[in-house]
């Protein structure tokens, strides 16, 4: 049977209501909607995205949850008029004017110096539309009509207390709300000082102790912005950027105590990424560390892991557990150590191709997996690190000097050391010779740019030294090249200003540090055996570049010595086909070395120890002119050879000689140093009864006691050498020590020459009693086991003329003669004899500094010897 196709019946056309027509939609789109917060009109297309940005501030105390609803109810509310869901609040009466009035942002800052921490500040909850032009709902079901009918009868919507996020207020209340919820974006130094005073008052009246590192950081900030510089000005608003001042204000005023603690902890550590969970375990004094992290992110002090965008950074902070979990996900062998796992994941991310042929998506997938396994990670922002480094540098440039890392590799964190020293001074466990409180401040930075350049230069040098110690010579050389480019691009006026500063101030400038970085470059090139390039860098520092010849005066002699060594020995002569050509080239190199020696001898900045080394090289060089006369004339020191017992067995630490002596009381052999073995030999076999291994500490202590008021003078004339309370010496305890105190030194030398023995001894006892608990650069109290009596007894054994000559050499050229003293100082109080002994073990040789001091002691009538200790093997290990 054939099927009959039914005809489609078309009914009458029903007109569409205007509210659901396309014209209404265009009209509504053209009208747009007005933001209830900023009172700006937006199109419907951009209104939703704008509301995601223009949301209620985190400190708004007028937000109140009026109702909760499901996803379906939210859809209906967006499509309908202004409605309030639920009947449970229909009978409640909510006053239109609440008792608690809104206060302006200024009033809040005055009354609440520490606003509460907001744990979460994402108020992206969709609310009912406030527009009266909403489209009709798509369907007119009975359920929807009943809900709408019930809600319209409720009077709560009209009388309720409305949130600024949900409804429009009057123009006046709207402006007040915006003042309350918008973060303070500007501040002045006076406001920062007021906040600091409020902070100090609050912690003084609080029962809960504030961590020392927070109090010390605030103390540093207060001194920087409130202490007058030497020119009568302050580090005020015209010195700092507006962003710097608002950062200071937010740190003191807006951050909670926990957030302050976390920020300072992150600052004194390396600026790396850190696991929040590990920080929570490490810093138990921070009660709510997660809330503190949220607060610091809100005020833009730190970054969260959303900015962790490189695979190398993620791999660097991942522990072995995280790496194994990620390796398992990508089916990589996880039975490896951490270093091998890092290499495997990096190789996998860079070698595997995605379906589109690239490796980027695979790398992103590995990075995403690492971030998932790591959890929450935070990092202090680089601009915050630089800003706080500026504060610490201004407070104490001596302690925060990057040269401390070179001289003492254990000082890896100078900023943490500074905070700890401030704590020690505050609780009285350590005393320093600096005035406390110190009324002075470093005043040689004309503007913020100069200060920031110096801070950046210190960071560059620290990185360069770290790369050198790790053996990454190529990276270290790149950093040195950056320093060289900075010097070449520095304006001439700025170079002249730096040259006008005194030496003890000039060493805290960027030009000084970058010049020192160029000196590091020569060491890097020598380690790479690129002696030709090293010579070119050294010539530039010493001869060609006139702008840096007033910098790093202490290092110029060393650079000269290394350059001459490279020219004389290390620089290989190219082999030419002809022997005569090779010989000619060799002669040219030696002639160049002789020429450089003559130029070096005219450099007044060369210290005696390098001058002696250059003189030794000149005497060996045949190409020197026949009329050459050595500038120094030193004799050969007396030598003595002794034997001491050593252990013949190796204990596995690489030491060849282990000296021992017999302890008769315990009847056992005791290990000792070669200096101790020599000291015991002299006391047992020579005329001396007392001796110490001090390497000059005894002589420095006597010098410090007799000239204490001159060296550590704190009057107004010497104000520029004291910058903070934690200095253990004036900043000019170097080349310019004598020049700034010449008259006082000469008066003291005349007094020591004519004063009787008892008067000088009484003066030594008086200074010892006053300063024996003080930590300073000159006096080493621990080397005198019997205290002041040992110190007086050795003073009685030193001939007066010899003592004056030794102390004059120290005073007039402190930087050149502060080191190199012989190892042992021996004396006999009964016979009034004294001697200095330089001890050398098997294979050791004298340095130029030691040769100079031995010659100087001998020339002034003090017994000076070189004691060579030979090993006498013992087969018994007791």
Swiss-Prot record:
Q: Please report which protein family the annotation says this sequence is part of.
A: Belongs to the FAN1 family.
Instruction: Give the compositionally biased regions (Low complexity).
Output: 168-179
Q: Where are the zinc fingers (UBZ4-type)?
A: 32-59
| Gene behind the chain | fan-1
Instruction: Indicate which residues the UniProt annotation says bind Zn(2+).
Output: 35, 38, 50, 54
Binding of Mn(2+) 1 occurs at: 823, 838-839
Q: Which GO terms describe its cellular component?
A: nucleus
Annotated keywords: DNA damage, DNA repair, Hydrolase, Magnesium, Manganese, Metal-binding, Nuclease, Nucleus, Zinc, Zinc-finger
Return one GO MF term.
Answer: flap-structured DNA binding
One Gene Ontology term from the biological process aspect of the record? interstrand cross-link repair
- Co-factor binding comment: Binds 2 magnesium or manganese ions per subunit.
Q: Which domain of life is it from?
A: Eukaryota
Recorded E.C. number(s)? Answer: 3.1.4.1
Query: Region (Disordered) spans which residues?
Result: 88-180
Start and end of every VRR-NUC domain? 757-870
Q: Where does Mn(2+) 2 bind?
A: 695, 823
Enzyme category, top tier = hydrolase
The protein depicted here goes by the name Fanconi-associated nuclease 1 homolog
Biased composition (Basic and acidic residues) is annotated at 142-161
Q: Where in the cell is it found?
A: Nucleus
Q: What is the lineage of its organism?
A: Eukaryota, Metazoa, Ecdysozoa, Nematoda, Chromadorea
- UniProt-listed InterPro entries: Fan1-like (IPR033315), FAN1-like_euk (IPR049132), FAN1-like_TPR (IPR049126), FAN1-like_WH (IPR049125), Rad18_UBZ4 (IPR006642), tRNA_endonuc-like_dom_sf (IPR011856), VRR_NUC (IPR014883)
Which chemical reaction does it catalyze? Hydrolytically removes 5'-nucleotides successively from the 3'-hydroxy termini of 3'-hydroxy-terminated oligonucleotides
Cofactor field: Mn(2+); Mg(2+)
Question: Is DNA repair among the key words of this record?
Answer: yes
Which species is this record about?
Caenorhabditis briggsae
Role according to the record? Nuclease required for the repair of DNA interstrand cross-links (ICL). Acts as a 5'-3' exonuclease that anchors at a cut end of DNA and cleaves DNA successively at every third nucleotide, allowing to excise an ICL from one strand through flanking incisions.
